[in-house]
Amino acid sequence: HAIESIVEEVESSKDSIVDTLERAIQSANRYIRIKSRENEDMNGMGTTVVAATITDDVMYVANVGDSRLYIINSGIRQITVDHSLVEEMVRMGGINRQQAREHQDKNIITRAIGAEDELKIDFFKVKLEKGDFILLCSDGLTNMIEDEEIRMLLLGQKDIVSKAETLVAAANRNGGKDNITVVLIEPFADEVNK
């Protein structure tokens, strides 16, 4: 239901994109908080979110937790910032990126939908270019495949469905310890393929 409430809010709103995303994610947060109070089996439940909407050549991104959004073209660029204990350690200089990938606490997130009554959401605005691919994914992918390998796997496939399937298969081959969510968007597909 949390996903449906975000989609409904975005589709029906007349407000700015950022305000709409904020309201939609806060609404999903309230829903999860209520459900976790009503049902003891759901106590403490939470989730991460990465959401994007595109208008012309501008993408607006919202994230909470450690699900990520990347732009892939000639390189790979992570747009979102993980809300995790190890990301804080990296930012403070305590560990490097490789140590973060292998750290025992890499799955401890510092923000999640459902964790707090008032949720802090990060927003990003990105200009897109022809040839860009957008990847939204869970940590089930990024814990199993490094960024450069993600880029190489995407470049090795022609169609977008094969690209997504290849990423999931590679994550599973590398251990697939968590749920693996992959959403690929090719915003200028019609223009590029002409």
Put a short name on every predicted segment:
Residues 1-194:
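PP2C/PPM-type serine/threonine phosphatase catalytic domain
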